[in-house]
Structures are given as structure tokens and as C-alpha cells.
């Protein structure tokens, strides 16, 4: 399968929920409508779609949300994706709040890597950005993933007047720990 520019498409992103346990102001501001339960695909539907895409040459699937770890049984989806012929890699984008407690099941299911959203190393600023006091849980999730050998990539979204000075501190983590840091452009959701 190829895109309109002739590039081979090998990557599928599955957004398994619109729910999140954080309220980052650039992603989940107040007033963003939630989907009705019947508007969200079941895991069986996701697996059927992934199998169809695999037959067209997709070999990598990224599980995202919202926050995918808030959806019950997400490790079963990972396991099912890994069982699809042609799917070589299953990754997840997460805020890592629930990663420490769910890491054993995800590791057993075959999760290949995680991208973790982290915009600051300052707990007070983290609480301001996310409207939640979960910095310690995120740090524990990062440590748990690294400890179990799951490759980690940190995604940092710099915001003018908020955390633009954090990029260097986050980048320094890559010198101390076996992880990568990626700075990504802010893409506001729900603003028209």
C-alpha cells in the first residue's frame, strides 16, 4: 500500500479511547466532547482492521488514545496484534501514569516499545500542565519500562511561556538513561 506521494505505508495508528487521566491544556482542554461508547471500536474490530492492513503491507502498529492504558484489557489487544501474521512491531504512546502497574501484562503481551509524553521534569510545572499531581507515577512508569527492557522514547511538547526551558533538561536524560527524547510541535485539539 502506498500514499499519494508513492511512499510505502507500513505503519498503522489505533486510537483505542478518547479518555485520558490527565488534562493537558494543549490536548484535553475543558469542553472537549467525549465519544459515546458505541462510537468506539471494540478490540475485535481493531484486530480485524489491523489484519486487513497487515495484508496490505503494514508491519507496525502504534496503540494510542487519549490514554490507552485507561481502557480495560488493552494488553489483550497488544497480544492479539502481535499474533497477526505480518505485524512485527507493536508500540504504544502513553502518559505513563498507569504504566508501572500494567507493565508486566504489557511485557508479557509482547509490547515492543513505548513513547511517553513528558513535558517537564519539574513536578509543580507538571501538575500545572496536566492539571493532575501524577509526576511520581510517570517517573515510576518510565523506570519500570526501562527496568524491564522496554525501549522508551520521551515526547516533549514545548509551549511558549510555559515549559520552553525544559528541552535541555529532558534531552540530558538521554545521556543518563537508555532512552530517546523527541521534541514535537504542539497541535491543539478541539479549537476548531
How should these model regions be labeled?
Residues 179:
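Ligand-binding loop in jelly-roll beta-barrel domains
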Amino acid at each position: 500500500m502506498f500514499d499519494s506521494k508513492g511512499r510505502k505505508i507500513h505503519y498503522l495508528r489505533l486510537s483505542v479511547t478518547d479518555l485520558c487521566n490527565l488534562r493537558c491544556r494543549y490536548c484535553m482542554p475543558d469542553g472537549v466532547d467525549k465519544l459515546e461508547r458505541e462510537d468506539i471500536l471494540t478490540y475485535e474490530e481493531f484486530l480485524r482492521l489491523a489484519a486487513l492492513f497487515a495484508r496490505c503491507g503494514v508491519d507496525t502498529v502504534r496503540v494510542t488514545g487519549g490514554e490507552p492504558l485507561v481502557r480495560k484489557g488493552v494488553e489483550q489487544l497488544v497480544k492479539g496484534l502481535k499474533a497477526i501474521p505480518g505485524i512485527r512491531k507493536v508500540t504504544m504512546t502513553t502518559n505513563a501514569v498507569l504504566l508501572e502497574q500494567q507493565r508486566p501484562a504489557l511485557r508479557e503481551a509482547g509490547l515492543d516499545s513505548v513513547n511517553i509524553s513528558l513535558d517537564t521534569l519539574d513536578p509543580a510545572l507538571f501538575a500545572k500542565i496536566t492539571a493532575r499531581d501524577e509526576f511520581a507515577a510517570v517517573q515510576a512508569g518510565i523506570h519500570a519500562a526501562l527496568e524491564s527492557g522496554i525501549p522508551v522514547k520521551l515526547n516533549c511538547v514545548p509551549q511558549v511561556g510555559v515549559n520552553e526551558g525544559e528541552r535541555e533538561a529532558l534531552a540530558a536524560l538521554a545521556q543518563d538513561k537508555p532512552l530517546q527524547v523527541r521534541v514535537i510541535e504542539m497541535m491543539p485539539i478541539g479549537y476548531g
